[in-house]
Amino acid sequence: MTIRDNHGVKVSGLAIMGGTFDPIHNGHLRTAVEILDRFHYSALKLIPCFQPVHKGRPSVLPQQRFEMAELAISSDDRLCVDSREMDREGPSYSIDTLRDLRSEVGPDESLIMVLGMDSFLSLPTWYKWQEIMDYAHLLVVSRPGWEPDLISELSGFCENYRAASPHELQCAPSGRVWFETLTPLGISSSMIRELARKKESIAYLLPEPVQKYIEQHQLYR
């Protein structure tokens, strides 16, 4: 996957964003498009998990979460929804997904996993978390003006893998960490679920086709 940026320079890289997407909302989508616009990666895959390892069971069926994600990205052909974790069923481990993707894109393609800061801070609790860097880079979306205290494991991890510039994520297939501040949107899936439960408006928090899908299927009631 190789394209040219606005200056004619070839840029490659496949970015991925995992999550429960219960439901997908404008915060997820804004993160995705800002990353694509800012770094000019070839594409970004949204990968809904079947069963999150560190959270409770999602509120709606896996197929419904997948369908909402597809509706949400239908107007941007740089985005796609990947069903591999849904197809696998059972707990969704990122390391398994990254191994699959690496085998598909080959050993030389840059693979970038996008994480929110909360997910990054919980990284040492993930299954085989230290092997992630063998397969991908991490692009961590940080909060404006917030410098979290890193536990010793993560502090050492950042010392070993932190990139000097985001360009390093495009020059190697894996093994670097970059922190990037994006536009903060105070939207969460739990907020939307609570509004829907109380039969209050969820307009403008998520794409209109997703809003209509939720209302049509009476989800989160």
Swiss-Prot record:
Instruction: Tell me the keywords, alphabetical order.
Output: ATP-binding, NAD, Nucleotide-binding, Nucleotidyltransferase, Pyridine nucleotide biosynthesis, Transferase
What GO molecular function terms would the record report? ATP binding; nicotinate-nucleotide adenylyltransferase activity
Q: Which residues form the signal peptide?
A: none
The UniProt entry's GO biological process terms, in alphabetical order, are: NAD biosynthetic process
Q: Which reaction does it catalyse?
A: nicotinate beta-D-ribonucleotide + ATP + H(+) = deamido-NAD(+) + diphosphate
According to its UniProt entry, this protein's organism is Marinomonas sp. (strain MWYL1)
EC number(s) stated in the UniProt entry for this protein: 2.7.7.18
Return the InterPro entries for the record. Answer: Cyt_trans-like, NadD/NMNAT, Rossmann-like_a/b/a_fold
Pathway, according to UniProt? Cofactor biosynthesis; NAD(+) biosynthesis; deamido-NAD(+) from nicotinate D-ribonucleotide: step 1/1
Q: What does this protein do?
A: Catalyzes the reversible adenylation of nicotinate mononucleotide (NaMN) to nicotinic acid adenine dinucleotide (NaAD).
- This protein's name: Probable nicotinate-nucleotide adenylyltransferase
Q: Which Pfam families match?
A: CTP_transf_like
Q: Which family does it belong to?
A: Belongs to the NadD family.
